[in-house]
């Protein structure tokens, strides 16, 4: 199972680095920071589906 450590989030700003992750909402997030901020916003209901684009 793919996991991402989001314990250091949320962060006020994310870099433009492109390392896509696919969320359980079937949405592609541009990088870990964008994904983790979304995880925090979802109160933990969003999880990582897999690394790479959906």
UniProtKB/Swiss-Prot annotation:
GO terms for molecular function: serine-type endopeptidase inhibitor activity. The record marks 16-17 as: Reactive bond 3. SMART domains: KAZAL. GO terms for cellular component: extracellular region. SUPFAM superfamilies: Kazal-type serine protease inhibitors (SSF100895). The keyword Repeat applies. Keywords: Disulfide bond, Glycoprotein, Protease inhibitor, Repeat, Secreted, Serine protease inhibitor. It is found in: Secreted. This is Ovomucoid. It comes from Dendrocygna arborea (West Indian whistling-duck).
